[in-house]
């Protein structure tokens, strides 16, 4: 069974701070709700819950606390393996029912690297990137986009209106 994920941010924000990460998370959640019917968010980190510390972990914890109090269905900080695998998440102290479908990366570097590795090594089909936060949907296609990529991106851009 195919699994769909929203990865964010993979293309735009070079210097992420707490406010930008919060906006990225909200926009990605809105896109997931429109395209996938639900949004369950992982705020990704090298740390799960309290297992590590540092500036990026502190930023993720603050975004988590703000958005959790606003009613978002999210988990974080959480490592990638725990975001994908419920059994690993449980061993690390995180419990979720449905699968997580929105992956929020702590930096453009992490997001872009993960997106390209999934596409190349994991044979994931990637569509986009979609630029969020604009009045109208915007898709930024790679110079290596195929005809199928262009058609799929166009269909999803229209669906997100």
Report residues per predicted region.
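Anion-binding alpha/beta catalytic cores of soluble intermediary-metabolism enzymes, centered on
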Residues: 1-161
């Amino acid at each position: 069974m195919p699994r769909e994920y929203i990865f964010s941010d993979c293309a735009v924000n070079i210097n992420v701070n707490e406010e930008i990460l919060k906006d990225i998370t909200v926009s990605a959640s809105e896109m997931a709700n429109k395209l996938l019917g639900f949004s369950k968010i992982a705020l990704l980190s090298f740390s799960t819950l309290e297992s590590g510390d540092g500036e990026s972990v502190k930023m993720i914890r603050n975004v988590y606390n703000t958005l959790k109090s606003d009613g978002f269905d999210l988990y974080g900080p959480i490592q990638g393996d725990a975001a994908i695998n419920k059994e690993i998440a449980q061993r690390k102290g995180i419990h979720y029912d449905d699968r997580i479908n929105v992956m929020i990366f702590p930096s453009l570097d992490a997001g872009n690297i993960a997106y390209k590795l999934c596409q190349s090594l994991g044979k994931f089909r990637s569509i986009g990137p979609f630029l969020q936060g604009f009045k109208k949907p915007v898709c930024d296609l790679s110079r290596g986009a195929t005809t199928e990529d262009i058609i799929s991106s166009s269909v999803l851009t229209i669906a997100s209106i």
